Amino acid sequence: KEFDLIEPSRAAYYRREITWNVFNEKANRFANLLIERGIKKGEKVGILLMNCLEWLPIYFGILKTGALAVPLNFRYSADEIKYCVELAEIDILVFGPEFIGRVEEIADEISKGRLLYFVGDGCPGFAEDYNAHTANCSSQSPKIDVNDDDDAAIYFSSGTTGFPKAILHNHESLMHAAKAEQNHHGQTKDDVFLCIPPLYHTGAKMHWFGSLLTGGKAVLLKGTSPKTILQAVSEEHCTIVWLLVPWAQDLLLALDNKELDIADYDLDQWRLMHIGAQPVPPSLIKHWKEYFPNHKYDTNYGLSESIGPGCVHLGVNNIDKVGAIGKAGYGWEAKIIDEQGETVKRGETGELAVKGPGVMTCYYRDPKATAEVLHDGWLYTGDMAKEDEDGFIFLVDRKKDVIISGGENI
């Protein structure tokens, strides 16, 4: 019930707009379609879509049935899609026009016992038309009991070697992500949140969950160019913007080179620049404040295994600690441990471990990998860190080498 949409008249998207009320109706229609097609609580529905107006209603339609939502990375090859469909035991796959070629390549193999729904114009012959099938479904919420400890979603890790791992989360985990986001940034129904990253990623949706919880306006943006971002902030009166480091760097470069002029945009309402998904250079924030001196700043640390961002965050009043990832977030605990799992002394380097309602249930169908990272409710992150004298956590290294590009491990 905490996910009820608070103000049905408030718009939810950029350019193509829908209200929260229509959003909810769309989610209900898809939920009822799934139920008509035999989807039961605990079964899985995959989402292979670019950011679009349909993405989030589809996601919540799945959750309303008690089934599990399984978002897939839009960069996956046909073989990777097939691997994820089979590992997660997906019963229905929803995909968009950008993926026709990849899905068609494996359709004969993955369609055995599975349904394929296509979102968009020109439905291919090997799939069924999402719009046509949902149009006549009931817009009433299905009467399915969903509990906090019920499985809710499977996310796939970025994966540093081989194929990605499947990460299982329950409904409590998703709900806590919404509460943490709202708590960390003081979001109200008057805030307008600009969501730019791909929605298959835990980070994008979990930040957006703050808007869902408050009934505030959310702006879903497809482009990442500096001009597109500033136009969206100006025209939609965005107050909170979540950026990745490359996007912030590109925006500053465009301002430095006089390609853009902030005087051309209405940006006075923009109160918070939120950045994360990879280490943030202090020099970037110093540079940012030259153009936006009144902005609050926050950074979040998180993993897909901790339902994305929020298990550690800097806090909007701690800009003097730029370079740190912060302290344990709302409802979370954090500690730094040695090889034996014992807490190290402040100032010493060890592995960061976190504990809270957003820790994954397990790596789906991989008990060995689960046992390596979950210990008495603590998630061992694989990130090496240390605390300063004030208890702020700084990342030092990875236990294993990894390259981060655009907020993702590769």
Describe each region flagged by the PLM.
Residues 213, 238-243, 252-320, 333:
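Gly/Ser/Thr-rich phosphate-binding loop
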Residues 17-21, 145, 152-176:
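Conserved AMP-binding A3 loop
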Residues 3-8, 12, 16, 100-148, ...:
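ANL superfamily adenylate-forming
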Residues 175-192, 200-240, 254-255, 260:
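Conserved AMP-binding/adenylation subdomain of ANL enzymes
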Residues 342-347, 351-410:
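Conserved ATP-binding/catalytic segment of the ANL
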Residues 136-156, 163, 186-192:
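Conserved pre-ATP/AMP-binding loop-to-beta segment of ANL
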Residues 1-52, 56-60, 77-82, 131, ...:
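Conserved AMP-binding/adenylate-forming core of the ANL superfamily
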Residues 36-37, 64-132:
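Structural core segment of the AMP-binding/adenylate-forming
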